[in-house]
Amino acid sequence: MGVPRPQPWALGLLLFLLPGSLGAESHLSLLYHLTAVSSPAPGTPAFWVSGWLGPQQYLSYNSLRGEAEPCGAWVWENQVSWYWEKETTDLRIKEKLFLEAFKALGGKGPYTLQGLLGCELGPDNTSVPTAKFALNGEEFMNFDLKQGTWGGDWPEALAISQRWQQQDKAANKELTFLLFSCPHRLREHLERGRGNLEWKEPPSMRLKARPSSPGFSVLTCSAFSFYPPELQLRFLRNGLAAGTGQGDFGPNSDGSFHASSSLTVKSGDEHHYCCIVQHAGLAQPLRVELESPAKSSVLVVGIVIGVLLLTAAAVGGALLWRRMRSGLPAPWISLRGDDTGVLLPTPGEAQDADLKDVNVIPATA
């Protein structure tokens, strides 16, 4: 079968559908979403991974950084010291396998290879493994637990399987991970950080206006750094529903989410509007008033001060580096949470809402 060109929207849809019974309603699943591209854009990773515990992202990795790092509330999980080193080692092996697959496919690309690997604990505490793969947005291969190898109907599946079989004990490592390592990790996470599954972070909100076409302005209601991802935004005019605008939604590198909704109104009428936000982290719906120009000026001053503080921090970092090179101990340890990889969506469904006057931000990007 021929291989179609990559369709980014299809890739996201595929990984939304693949989990099956491992939906967001279950908090007892551990899933790794792996993606590799044969022709990455300059400055972007060729391979990246997001790890999910139930509906929450707990891990990120990409080939530029080369280290597995915790996300969201899992940054504070009381894990054993070697845990993240083990995650890093395993994902570097996966990175090598995925990039080797492109050699087996030849140079006809571009190709996008994705994998969904993990396990779910059933009611009787037994583990149900998942190991499926997609090429350019179409599922084409899985890992057969009985045969202990990869297989599929496409010739590309045979080519990749043969290539991976040549790697040192790759099939045995895959089998061991699915049947033993994955359920063990899942049980450890549930034991050490079950409270993190109830993590709720309320959004920081802002409502701003900017000029649009002659005689009109655009109101933008923005929500920052919230979790869980389900969120409702709606506009009111003098207390009455004002319809919905154009929405935007996406994940942050720390496991939280951001969203916004924009509405076009008549110039001079902006002060009649407000934004209402509903979220699990809020005790009640929050009313967000239009930000005044004076407040915006204060924000600009704050940004300038922030830049100055970052500059000072950079100078301090240079001094710290020199201190460490000279053999002196470091006075602190800093956690880094950047991620240049594109995060894949979590399985789940959006919260129901009245679409006539509510802008619903879905649980999947």
Curated annotation (Swiss-Prot):
Top-rank taxon of the source lineage equals: Eukaryota
Q: Which GO terms describe its biological process?
A: IgG immunoglobulin transcytosis in epithelial cells mediated by FcRn immunoglobulin receptor; immune response
NAD recorded as keyword: no
Protein's membrane topology = Single-pass type I membrane protein
Name assigned to this protein: IgG receptor FcRn large subunit p51
Q: Does the keyword Transcription apply?
A: no
Q: Upper lineage ranks?
A: Eukaryota, Metazoa, Chordata, Craniata, Vertebrata
**From what organism does this protein derive?**
Homo sapiens (Human)
Q: How is this protein annotated for GO cellular component? A: endosome membrane; external side of plasma membrane; extracellular space
Q: In which tissues is it expressed?
A: Expressed in full-term placenta, heart, lung, liver, muscle, kidney, pancreas, and both fetal and adult small intestine.
Functionally, this protein is described as follows:
Cell surface receptor that transfers passive humoral immunity from the mother to the newborn. Binds to the Fc region of monomeric immunoglobulin gamma and mediates its selective uptake from milk. IgG in the milk is bound at the apical surface of the intestinal epithelium. The resultant FcRn-IgG complexes are transcytosed across the intestinal epithelium and IgG is released from FcRn into blood or tissue fluids. Throughout life, contributes to effective humoral immunity by recycling IgG and extending its half-life in the circulation. (Microbial infection) Acts as an uncoating receptor for a panel of echoviruses including Echovirus 5, 6, 7, 9, 11, 13, 25 and 29.
Q: Record's SMART domains?
A: IGc1
Coiled-coil annotated residue ranges, if any: none
- Signal peptide start and end residues: 1-23
According to the UniProt record, where is the region Alpha-2?
Answer: 111-200
Region Alpha-3: list its residue ranges: 201-290
Regions of this protein lying in the Extracellular compartment = 24-297
Give the keywords, sorted.
Answer: Cell membrane, Disulfide bond, Endosome, Glycoprotein, IgG-binding protein, Immunoglobulin domain, Membrane, Phosphoprotein, Receptor, Signal, Transmembrane, Transmembrane helix
